[in-house]
Each structure stands twice: as structure tokens, then as C-alpha cells.
Amino acid sequence: VVYEIHEEKHYVVGRVRIAGNTITRDRVNRRDVALLPGQPLRLEELETTRQRLLEDANVASAQVRTVQGDGPNVADIEVSIEERRHIGTLEVGGGADAGAGEVGYIRVHQPNLDLFRWPRSATDWEGAFQGGGQELELELIPGTKESEYRARFVEPYFFRSDFSFSITGGTAYYDRRTYSEDHIKGAAAIQKFFDRGHRLSLALGYIADAVRVHDLDDDAPADAFDVEGRTFLAYPRLELRLREASRDFFSGPRGFSGLLRLDAAGDVTGSEVDFTRALATLDWSMGFFARIPELEHVLHVGAAFGWMEGRGEPVPLYERFYLGGPRTFPGFEYRRLGPHDGKTPVGGEGDVHGVVDYSFPFLRPEVRPFAIFEWGDLEPALSQISTERFRTAVGGGLQLRFKIAGQLIPANLYWVKALASEPEDREELFSFTLGINF
């Protein structure tokens, strides 16, 4: 048998042209183009480019094709897009969380802002303040026990570089049963992505937080009396992220994500409290038994490792790690796994915990039963973490995902039984989250 192979020409990318973007600047769409002039042409990257464009909120449809370039082995890339005319969103809703109380929710989001695109005349308002790829987000979350109000702005091309710049500010109020806690907080960060898919990034930020602890009851913990009044915290944050994952509204994420975070506060950073804190998280999810993401069975494994230590004095209780409740450790009441002073949780400086869960669609993708196993320990110091004190919990529940009048309504119901606990813990068989942003 003789095989004859006729090898096609090897092409390189020539020019990349973008058409159809009457509102959005070219550089905003070019960040999604996986092909660069001068590099070898790979056909799979044409589809990658199209998929990335379709993930942008400002793109309604996209086509990517090759045409003959200036040389015999040169292929130009033509990108044709159709823009959405209105992409800003206003969300209004509410929800509840076992232990954290009920909340209202108002969110305004504009993912394609341009602060420097001012109207050129009194009638030029259709494209004003649009097309720059900047992001503005406002969130108002008033609640019965916890309230948060924040604003966030992101410039993805800081001074036309590959760095993004973000600034965040807001206030928060928390009712901790035996005392109250207020925050006025601001943060700024510069982030560098190391690949065009925005999978690996390194961010350097600075956080300032004015904290007030007040309205202490007689039985409030001693740690709360130690920090009563106003305290100013200021510290840099270094954060390394890896995210090789996609997400489906009904069935959740697929792939791998990891986070390494380091905070260091002290006199030199402008903080009234000295401490060092590190956090590492890992999450991996895989789908099975279906080609359509929303119909897949999903196995998820996650783990978190936290350490902090004060320099000369304990870390304030409002900066410590807490576990318990449906968001962090179902089977235990909200924040009530781990160290307590009387009836009030005071958190810990050493945290190790993880989860394994398995979910699948039941008749419809909106309804997903799941089984869950939780494990972990929270102690006053990392050196006190012990497998003999590991808490474990097992159970199941329902993930419900609905769209009502265009509004996404997620709800999670947990029936989880603690298998191993300590005397200071507060167990909880049923817990739930309901509403937006849970």
C-alpha cells in the first residue's frame, strides 16, 4: 500500500480587520481575537475567536473568515460583528439566606462604558458614554441583618496597556447578635493577564477599611470589647488567579480554578492593626453523561486553606475566618462552626475545609438534586488544626434555577446532617439560599 500525501500551504496571519462595530472601539473587540499578525494560521483559533466574541455582552452575532492576504502564504482575517444596541442592565429583586437574614437587591451594570465618549452635540446621545469596554457596577443590598452598598469601576486597558485597573468603594453593616459592625471600604488594584484567554492573572491591590464596632451587649465576646470603637485598616493585597473553566446557569462551572491571596497590614502600610493573612482555594468540576451542559451530571471538588497571624496582638475578630451556613459549610449554623465566646462566634486564624458534591438534572434542567459531603476545621491558630477535630457533614438537597420575567432566580435547599462536631458548634439540619446573587 502506498500513500501519497499532498501537503497544503502553511499560512501566516496578515491583517486583522473588524467590521460592524459602530459603537464599540476596535481595541475592545481585538482583545477577543486569538489570531495575531505574523503568527501561524490555525483554523481552530477562528472558532475560538468567534466564541469569545459571542461571550461579550455587546456582541449579538459574529462571523470570522479568512481572505487572501498580500503574500502567497498570507491570510487576512475578517471579523464581522453585529452589536447589541442596549446592553446595560437593571436588576431588582431580593432573597434570603439561613442565618444571614432577608435582603433586597438592586444592581445596575454597564459592561461597555466609555467615560471619555462625551456627546458631541445636544442630540448626540445614542452612543454617548458607550463603546470603551469599561465596566461600571452598582449594587444596593439592604437587609435585616446584613446590608451592603458598593460601586465598582474597571478600566481593562489602563493607559492603553495590557494591564487592567479597578476601583471599588462601599459601605456595609452587620448585626452580629451581641454587637454591631460597620465598614466604609475602598480598594484599588492593577491586574495583569498572562494569556489572551484571560486564564492566568496576577493582581496587586491596596485596601482601606474604616471599621466601627458598637452597640455591644453585656455578654458580647471579650474580643469585641478589645476592638470597640473605630479602627482603620490599610494593606496591600497580592492575588494570583488561574481559571480554566466555563459556566452554565443551570449546572454551574466546568473546569479548574485556583486562587492564591496574600494580605500584609502594618504601620508601614498605614494600618492601625498589624497582621499577615494568606488564603488558597482550589475548585474542580467535570460534567458527565450528556453533550448539552445544562443536562450533564456534575462532580465538584473544592478545598480552601487559610492562615493569618497578628504581629504583637491578635487579629481583630472582624478580619478572621468563619465557617458555617449554606455558603461555606452546610450542616452548621451561619458562622457558628469553630471558636465561640459564650453564644457568639469569634472566628479563627487557621482554616482548612473542603467539599465534594454531585448533581444531576431531574426531568428538567431547572431542577437538580445533589448529594454533598463537607469536611474541615477552624481553630484559633493554624497550629491547632487537627484531624481529630475535623467536622464532617453529609446530605443532599435541590438546586433550583428559574427565569421569571427575564430575571434569573436561583435557589439552593440543603438537608445536611453533621456527622462529627465539637461542643462549641451549632448544628443545623436545613438551610437555604434564595434570590439574586447567591
Where do the protein language model's features map onto the residues?
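C-terminal structured "cap/appendage" subdomains that terminate the fold
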Residues: L378, I385-A405, I409-A411, W415
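Outer-membrane beta-barrel proteins
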Residues: L140-G143, A172-H183, A265-D274, L419-E422
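Outer-membrane beta-barrel channels and translocator barrels
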Residues: V59, G99-G101, L113-L115, G131-G133, ...
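Periplasmic polypeptide-binding modules associated with outer-membrane biogenesis and secretion
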Residues: V1-D97, Q110, W118-E155, E181-I184, ...
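C-terminal outer-membrane beta-barrel translocator/porin domains of Gram-negative envelope proteins
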Residues: E55, D70, I77, H86-G101, ...
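Transmembrane beta-barrel wall of Gram-negative outer-membrane proteins
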Residues: P142-R230
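One face of beta-strands
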Residues: A62, I77, L90-V92, E102-I106, ...
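Solvent-exposed, non-transmembrane alpha-helical starts
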Residues: Y11-R15, D162, R199-S201, F249-F250
